[in-house]
């Protein structure tokens, strides 16, 4: 009996021991199966890697560093970096820099500022603790910089007054005041019909190759007459940002500014077509920060965004690669906010804030003249008016090819030079009547005298508004020309001789009535006596022409 009991106990111990031995094997098998099933689910890749990385002894702090899970198309997905901020700069161990755009559970989506070929899977990524910031101050004048504010013109380091974040909040309602000072472009068609004020956002919109950049460039060149002086309140510093353009185009622009002695008061921010999409997305914000330094220090600046269509395309590319939900035309839902937060930074500040201003001239490229597309309508609704350039007018030789009917300035009339407002008041009405009559005149030759008169004057006014590139006119030169056109002094002159009349009339005034031009420039308005003198001078010249 005792022998039987001992045998049963021995068998029990053997079974218990074998069960204990089997448990780890079963657990290992289950773990293997679970791992296999996990591999089949890509969404859990980050958690698997997290477990593995945690298993490595003394791995660097995951709050401050991370490891690359995957890289491609200029996007790196990184595990770790638990304490990272949105839009913070990071540095890869290969030396490439990037910016955190997507903060997701378990991983961070980082856009790369350099080539993604240099970044490898498993590579270490470190936080820098810095949100994207750029150098600002007068030391940038005459320089060409990239989207991060680094000099690319070979003229050595920049003597910056400080650094500013690329993306900052726009001024609120109380620090602003209404637009009341003019930005003179030197273009008769713009200054007379769609005037721009300091602190305004005026959109330049049109198809490719219709002269959009030419309008902006002439505006920059026209500021030379004030920037060469010593009156800081009249100076207008210019910032030009090239987004997605050819490098040869940017080089040509710099050369043009240098030839006309305009580079000394200008800053070029370039994110060319060959550069990464994140840099094209960032460049306008960098330029805005550079311009804001002048605004916030009681000075005046003009910023040209050329063009925001390409910035929207770059942002769409980034958003789709980061797997953000697409909306209309595959743009992300916040593309409106992209442009509104940028353009709201243009403002005229109150006296309490220093009376500085930042004026924006955003450029938008349309396809086939379609201004009702997504991005054009967005920017039209954000801005204070638009200058619409038409391919049809451009090919007819009417340059600048401004469609006067579709172009408007919603706040600029309050800032228009009074003398120009006095003579150009009826110009828009004459041109509107001319367009209406010209459409019907094609179908019939039987026209009454008043219709013929409208056609004659409209043709001459259209011809008068033509202007060669790089030849901006001062206000005191524009006023007599528009006065002559609106008051019918050109009606008897042949259409082909209007250009000749323009140059001869200005030469005549400078030689014989220079005090008249000086008075218009200094007073800025036409008194009764000045108007009588202008009428007399115009009539005497037309009689001899």
Curated annotation (Swiss-Prot):
Effect noted on mutating residue 291 to D = In ATP1-2; growth-defect
The UniProt record lists the keyword Transport: yes
Could you identify this protein by its name?
A: ATP synthase subunit alpha, mitochondrial
Does the keyword field hold ATP-binding? yes
Record's subunit section:
F-type ATPases have 2 components, CF(1) - the catalytic core - and CF(0) - the membrane proton channel. CF(1) has five subunits: alpha(3), beta(3), gamma(1), delta(1), epsilon(1). CF(0) has three main subunits: a, b and c.
A Gene Ontology biological process noted in the UniProt record is: proton motive force-driven ATP synthesis
The note filed under miscellaneous reads: Present with 41500 molecules/cell in log phase SD medium.
Gene3D superfamilies, per database record: 2.40.30.20, ATP synthase alpha/beta chain, C-terminal domain, P-loop containing nucleotide triphosphate hydrolases
Q: Which GO terms describe its cellular component?
A: cytosol; mitochondrial inner membrane; mitochondrial intermembrane space; mitochondrial nucleoid; mitochondrion; proton-transporting ATP synthase complex
PANTHER family for this protein:
ATP SYNTHASE SUBUNIT ALPHA, MITOCHONDRIAL (PTHR48082:SF2)
Organism placement in taxonomy: Eukaryota, Fungi, Dikarya, Ascomycota, Saccharomycotina
Stretch forming the transit peptide = 1-35
- Residue numbers of Phosphoserine PTMs: 57, 178
- Tell me what gene encodes this: ATP1
């Amino acid at each position: 009996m005792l022998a039987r009991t001992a045998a049963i106990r021995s068998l029990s111990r053997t079974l218990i021991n074998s069960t204990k031995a089997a448990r780890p094997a079963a657990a290992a098998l289950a773990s293997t199966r679970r791992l296999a099933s996990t591999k089949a689910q890509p969404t859990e890749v980050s958690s698997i890697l997290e477990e593995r990385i945690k298993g490595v002894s003394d791995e660097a702090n995951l709050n401050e560093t991370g490891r690359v899970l995957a890289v491609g198309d200029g996007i790196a997905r990184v595990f770790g970096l638990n304490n990272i901020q949105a839009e913070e700069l990071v540095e890869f161990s290969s030396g490439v820099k990037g910016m955190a755009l997507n903060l997701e559970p378990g991983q961070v989506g980082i856009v790369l500022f350099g080539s993604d070929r240099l970044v490898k899977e498993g590579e270490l990524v470190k936080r820098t603790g810095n949100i994207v910031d750029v150098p600002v101050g007068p030391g940038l004048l005459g320089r060409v910089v990239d989207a991060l504010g680094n000099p690319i013109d070979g003229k050595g380091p920049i003597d910056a007054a400080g650094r500013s974040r690329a993306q900052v909040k726009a001024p609120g309602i109380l620090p602003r005041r209404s637009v009341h000072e003019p930005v003179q472009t030197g273009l008769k068609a713009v200054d007379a019909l769609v005037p721009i004020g300091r602190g305004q956002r005026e959109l330049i919109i049109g198809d490719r190759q219709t002269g959009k950049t030419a309008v902006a460039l002439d505006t920059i060149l026209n500021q030379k007459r004030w920037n060469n002086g010593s009156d800081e309140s009249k100076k207008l510093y210019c910032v030009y940002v090239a987004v997605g353009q050819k490098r040869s185009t940017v080089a040509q622009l710099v050369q043009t500014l240098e030839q006309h002695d305009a580079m000394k008061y200008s800053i070029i921010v370039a994110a060319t077509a060959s550069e990464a999409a994140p840099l094209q997305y960032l460049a306008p914000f960098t330029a805005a920060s550079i311009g804001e330094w002048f605004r916030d220090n009681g000075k005046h600046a003009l910023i040209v965004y050329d063009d925001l269509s390409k910035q929207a395309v770059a942002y769409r590319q980034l958003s789709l690669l980061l797997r953000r939900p697409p909306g209309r035309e595959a743009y992300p839902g916040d593309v409106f906010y992209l442009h509104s937060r940028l353009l709201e930074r243009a403002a005229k500040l109150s006296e309490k804030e220093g009376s500085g201003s930042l004026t924006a001239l955003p450029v938008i490229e349309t396809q086939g003249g379609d201004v009702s597309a997504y991005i054009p309508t967005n920017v039209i609704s954000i801005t204070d008016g638009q200058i619409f350039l038409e391919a049809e007018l451009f090919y007819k030789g009417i340059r600048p090819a401004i469609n006067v009917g579709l172009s408007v300035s919603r706040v600029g009339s309050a800032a228009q030079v009074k003398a120009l407002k006095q003579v150009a008041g009826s110009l828009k009405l004459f041109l509107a009547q001319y367009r209406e009559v010209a459409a019907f005149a094609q179908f019939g030759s039987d026209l009454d005298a008043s219709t013929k008169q409208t056609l004659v004057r409209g043709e001459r006014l259209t011809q008068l508004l033509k202007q060669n590139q790089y030849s901006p006119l001062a206000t005191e030169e524009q006023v007599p020309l528009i006065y002559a056109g609106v008051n019918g002094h050109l009606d008897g002159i042949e259409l082909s001789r209007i250009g000749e009349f323009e140059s001869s009339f200005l030469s005549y005034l400078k030689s014989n009535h220079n005090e008249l031009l000086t008075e218009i420039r200094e007073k800025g308005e036409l008194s009764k006596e000045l108007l009588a003198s202008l009428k007399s001078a115009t009539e005497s010249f037309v009689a001899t022409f």
